[in-house]
Amino acid sequence: MALRLILGFDYGTKQIGVAVGQVITGQARELCTLKAQNGVPDWNQVEALIKEWKPDAVVVGLPLNMDGTPSEMCARAEKFARRLNGRFNLPFYTHDERLTTFEAKGERLVRGGQKGSYRDNPVDAIAAALLLQGWLDENTALFES
């Protein structure tokens, strides 16, 4: 199956950032931030995104520790990826998301956003775009014919 469009997810227990990426252009951009209750999203909202964008696959960020070992959240992020696969029959990939939230906060400031609190100014969708962009950059060989 040729991959053309991919959704990226920055998984969190309170918020989940979502981004979209196109393989042909090799570019990713943020879409939205979904609310979550203890890591569980509103699956109806996720389904609406899947129906609207019709992705060929999903990429879920893995929150690894700085030394590359799995963090406590890695198992939850992987479970979320498996649930996406089970509910929507989409292949999934995972990608190291270290420092994407930090980078996303800087990106928000560059764009003229407010420093403010993380809760009031979420950067999850930007982080999702950064991790998806990283995945696209590292996996271009998969898409070349």
From Swiss-Prot:
Localization per Swiss-Prot or TrEMBL: Cytoplasm
Alphabetized InterPro entries for the sequence: RNaseH-like_sf, YqgF, YqgF/RNaseH-like_dom, YqgF/RNaseH-like_dom_sf
Superkingdom per UniProt: Bacteria
EC number(s) per entry: 3.1.-.-
Main location: cytoplasm
An annotated Gene Ontology molecular function: nuclease activity
GO process terms (BP): rRNA 5'-end processing
Gene Ontology cellular-component annotations: cytosol
CDD domains with a match to the protein in the record: YqgF
Stated role: Could be a nuclease involved in processing of the 5'-end of pre-16S rRNA.
Stored HAMAP family: Nuclease_YqgF (MF_00651)
Similarity section: Belongs to the YqgF nuclease family.
Protein name: Putative pre-16S rRNA nuclease
Natural source organism: Pseudomonas fluorescens (strain Pf0-1)
